Amino acid sequence: NTYNIGTDAKRWATGNFANVTTNTLTTNDLDFGNINLISTPGNIYYVATNGNDARPGEHPQDPVRTIAQGLSLAGVGDTVYIYPGQYQEAFPLNVPMGVTVKGHSLRSVEISPTSGTQSNDAFVMQGDSTVEDLTVKDFFYNSGSNTGYGFRFANNFRVYLRSPYIRNVTVITKGTTTSN
């Protein structure tokens, strides 16, 4: 979690803490008052084939339609939970720092690219992110442009707490293309 130190008008620092447990916080000439250092779980954003991207997606009975919309809503500590189904998404799907993308189960969630994005990377990962329990399929690796990977790290990739995790994911490409 990120904690802002100071008031809105006089914010002088931001700190990232995880799993902090303390009875006493001792500092030199700093007064910390009313700070909650208890790490709380983030929000869950739900995605389903019958969802609606105009909805907030914060309840299992009111999901968004696209994974991209779920990712746009999510922030550090949040989870994008994907119900079973076949999803067609514009690749790449950008996973923000600290966000978990979790499919219902490995074979029940299938993600394929929309027309025109088949040679793009499927997922671009930031630090501390996770993708798990899903299948990515029907895209091409393009050896000429070096694109079309299942997973790639973002250009400005940084690790704060841990590196990205990719677990229980099946990647099925349609083959390889060559371009200049």
Annotated model-derived regions:
Residues 32-69, 86, 105:
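Right-handed parallel beta-helix/beta-solenoid
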Residues 1-42, 175:
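Intrinsic low-complexity, repeat-rich intrinsically disordered segments enriched
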Residues 138-154, 172-180:
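Surface-exposed, glycine- and small/polar-enriched segments that build interaction surfaces at terminal
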Residues 12-15, 82, 100-103, 130-136, ...:
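All-beta strand scaffolds that present successive hydrophobic residues in beta-strands
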Residues 99-149:
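Right-handed parallel beta-helix/beta-spiral solenoid domain characteristic of secreted/periplasmic
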Residues 5-7, 35-37, 67-75, 87-96, ...:
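Short, T/G/N/S-enriched strand-turn elements that build extracellular solenoid repeat scaffolds
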Residues 1, 20-22, 49-55, 78, ...:
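Acidic glycine-/aspartate-rich tracts in secreted/extracellular proteins
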